[in-house]
Amino acid sequence: MAGEGDPEDAAHNMGNHLPLLPAEEEEEDEIEMEVEDQDNKEPKKPNIINFDTSLPTSHTYLGSDMEEFHGRTLHDDDSCPVIPVLPQVVMTLIPGQTLPLQLFSPQEVSMVRNLIQKDRTFAVLAYSNVQEREAQFGTTAEIYAYREEQDFGIEVVKVKAIGRQRFKVLEIRTQSDGIQQAKVQILPECVLPSTMSAVQLESLNKCRIFPSKPVSWEDQCSYKWWQKYQKRKFHCANLTSWPRWLYSLYDAETLMDRIKKQLREWDENLKEDSLPSNPIDFSYRVAACLPIDDVLRIQLLKIGSAIQRLRCELDIMNKCTSLCCKQCQETEITTKNEIFSLSLCGPMAAYVNPHGYVHETLTVYKASNLNLIGRPSTDHSWFPGYAWTIAQCRICASHIGWKFTATKKDMSPQKFWGLTRSALLPTIPDTEDDISPDKVILCL
């Protein structure tokens, strides 16, 4: 077991430390480092989930007495503001995604205090090369909850922020106090017209009906009427040389429905009213919960159209069905079929441990090729009521995530896995058509 002062151990632990074992229990600890293959004997998914899915999104481990702010700060499209950069944040933030932080350095604490007095906005850079700190794109983040406290005489700032707008990096300068200032260009969202707008007479627009999708299908009349509307939606395609299915490939409503079918496989109790109805917000919501690496995520962040972003996300969800260890690249950890949602924001969200490391954690029912390190601990658990145990790759021993086990017998699920996105590599399984996964091109 790594020492408490080991920075690598600090990144993987959720609590301040793992319980130290007496000398006579060292053999027992060795027994706990077993491959978790016994999960295959259990059913894939429990029938009932009685865990309060609002708890992970509230980030109660940061404290319940945080000062909350209201209002939003939005910059004009194509404007070029200068925004301070938080150097500790190393993740590709998606607009609408929540970012929890714990900051300890005096430089960062002072910076956040100044932000609170101004517009509460800072820049999160999407590093294409983390080692060389290279970034061409990023996202603005706005602080909406804030708390200061002292831990053993050290000032600590706890923050909850949310991603707002995409930007392109124009220039980065470092001030005399060490704070980086980024001059950025706010990227606009390109809103495309309806696929049928080119062949429809504008003079008849006042006669057309633009209905909203029924929330419930219990009413048979609403269901039948909606089916008729869907059939007639692309009726004008008969006036063109292209079939109607081609137009549906670029229709926002159709793309959103196809993605929702995929999301229901992750969450059988998914309520459509909990998802954004706007295609732009919906596309960002999906991007934030996709277990993809930074390369693919930056590609999604660069896309300026919700239609194109939705098409790419649907392509990724259909093709990248296997998740492997990023270090080994061939050791399969889990598959898309094992993903499920234990949070209101979806199957994946960002969490921060007491040492300030941010982990985007994906919840899955089953995982393979993993060893457990240490014993379960409830310290600083991101899922209240569950104890966590560090999980490493069986082949290369790199950190993959944690196994969560319920502390009470009446909780469901009794156990699940939380896998950190940075340790996963989405892959395309081999097909019978002898097409190499390397040759399969995603819709990017």
Curated annotation (Swiss-Prot):
(S)-thalidomide binds at residues 380, 382, 388. Pathway: Protein modification; protein ubiquitination. Residues 1-52 are annotated as: Disordered. Signal peptide: none annotated. Its main location: cytoplasm. It comes from the Eukaryota. Ubiquitinated, ubiquitination is mediated by its own DCX protein ligase complex. It is a peripheral membrane protein. The keyword Zinc applies. Residues 23-37 have a biased composition (Acidic residues). GO terms for molecular function: metal ion binding. Belongs to the CRBN family. Substrate recognition component of a DCX (DDB1-CUL4-X-box) E3 protein ligase complex that mediates the ubiquitination and subsequent proteasomal degradation of target proteins, such as MEIS2, ILF2 or GLUL. Normal degradation of key regulatory proteins is required for normal limb outgrowth and expression of the fibroblast growth factor FGF8. Maintains presynaptic glutamate release and consequently cognitive functions, such as memory and learning, by negatively regulating large-conductance calcium-activated potassium (BK) channels in excitatory neurons. This is Protein cereblon. It comes from Bos taurus (Bovine).
